[in-house]
């Protein structure tokens, strides 16, 4: 990992990272919204507090490293260098959703996975995934109001039930993700759950044929969830150590699958699942060989902006996807300046 020691170069790196996060490598620009990245980040800070020099959301995390190798079939759908068939180095970060660094690993909230693929010629491709098949809101405004709704009341220390109810009524698209989390206990390990890209993207191949896709990583170790008894007995912190021990035993792997969209499938709404009969294609395998606590490790300084893409992969106009880049850049700028 390259460490930036000179202060001037550090500021330059922050500025460049913010620029890249804003435009990506294959971005179509920001969608017009009624909220700004600064408002959303301020809302997150107001709800969870500020942990100086750390991420504002998905703050509790674990680093891992490994590689990705594409299948030969992947090139049929995308000309991205990710699908060259060569071994692509990967820096991964597993996390719990939210801004509480002491959140228990038994919490019924999403688990996140950030992936940075280190492509040839000093280029990168990022992915930001959750272990829920759909997202909770369809707009930046919905995300902003959700963060405000779950803010603890100063008197009770818990979210105001009336505000939560009002949010759910205003944004009924939240029901699908909420139902998934309520009916599925957390995974036994970061290695025992699928991770979904949530948004739709465009794959472009060598003949400029474009296909709408969604993607997910399916664990070769299988899906395993805590039983109710295990959930009650589990310690507050177990996910990191289990992942470290699992990678020490042998490499842990996920198969990378794309789902091919058809006309009429939701292109710009991550709260709507595509029909289950859509064709799926395996396009590669992610292998992680080592995991470690986050402080000082490779993933700590990475901004996993999902709009940092490559030739052959383009974003859609999904307003949530388009909005994330600005919030990620602002959060990255703050934490790397020790704020």
Swiss-Prot record:
EC number(s) given by UniProt? 1.11.1.-
Specify where it is mainly localized.
Answer: periplasm
The annotated consequence of gene deletion is:
No significant differences in the growth kinetics of cells grown in medium containing high or low concentrations of sulfate.
Which GO biological process annotations does it have? hydrogen peroxide catabolic process; hydrogen peroxide metabolic process; response to hydrogen peroxide
- Alphabetically ordered keywords of this record: Heme, Iron, Metal-binding, Oxidoreductase, Periplasm, Peroxidase, Plasmid, Signal, Stress response
Q: Which GO terms describe its cellular component?
A: cytoplasm; periplasmic space
Question: What positions does UniProt annotate as the active site of this protein?
Answer: 58
Q: Where is the signal peptide?
A: 1-31
List the subcellular locations: Periplasm
Indicate which residues the UniProt annotation says bind heme. Answer: 328
First-tier enzyme category under EC: oxidoreductase
What's a Pfam family this protein contains? Catalase
| Function according to Swiss-Prot or TrEMBL | Has an organic peroxide-dependent peroxidase activity.
So what family is this one in?
Belongs to the catalase family.
Q: What is this protein called?
A: Catalase-related peroxidase
Q: Which organism is it from?
A: Synechococcus elongatus (strain ATCC 33912 / PCC 7942 / FACHB-805) (Anacystis nidulans R2)
Underlying gene: srpA
